Amino acid sequence: MGRSRRTGAHRAHSLARQMKAKKRRPDLDEIHRELRPQGLPRPKPEPDAEPDPDLPGGGLHRCLACARYFIDSANLKTHFRSKDHKKRLKQLSVEPYSQEEAERAAGMGSYVQPQRLGVPTEVSTDIPEMDTST
């Protein structure tokens, strides 16, 4: 018996690459730009707005720090207590890497330690529930 040819083996990872690119989350500096008060804020969903059918929960319950959508507010609140969310808040508390810091690292200045930034713990675009108790 001879050796079998592995035809098409060079295309084996193309689907995995597509899925990896599809699930890619925004980088920390992009999230910092969103969370800054002077940055352009992402518009909050209106209560009477039409939900986006492509996003979980219609895109109404989003954690800005983790850039994730959730199906309802209960899952969003559970996420706020999770280890992944707390780890992301710790990553966001460090000032993002800047051009000035890169120049200092290249020898064009003295080292300045990155500042710690205050990040709100519950950062979401959740629509508050209407009070119907009266």
Swiss-Prot record:
It comes from the Eukaryota. The keyword Zinc applies. Residues 26-36 have a biased composition (Basic and acidic residues). Residues 1-58, 85-134 are annotated as: Disordered. Its main location: nucleus. GO terms for cellular component: cytoplasm; nucleolus; nucleoplasm; nucleus. Keywords: Cytoplasm, DNA-binding, Metal-binding, Nucleus, Ribosome biogenesis, Transcription, Transcription regulation, Zinc, Zinc-finger. One of its GO terms (molecular function) is preribosome binding. The protein is largely disordered, with the exception of the zinc finger domain. Associates with pre-60S ribosomal particles. This is Zinc finger protein 593. The gene is Znf593.
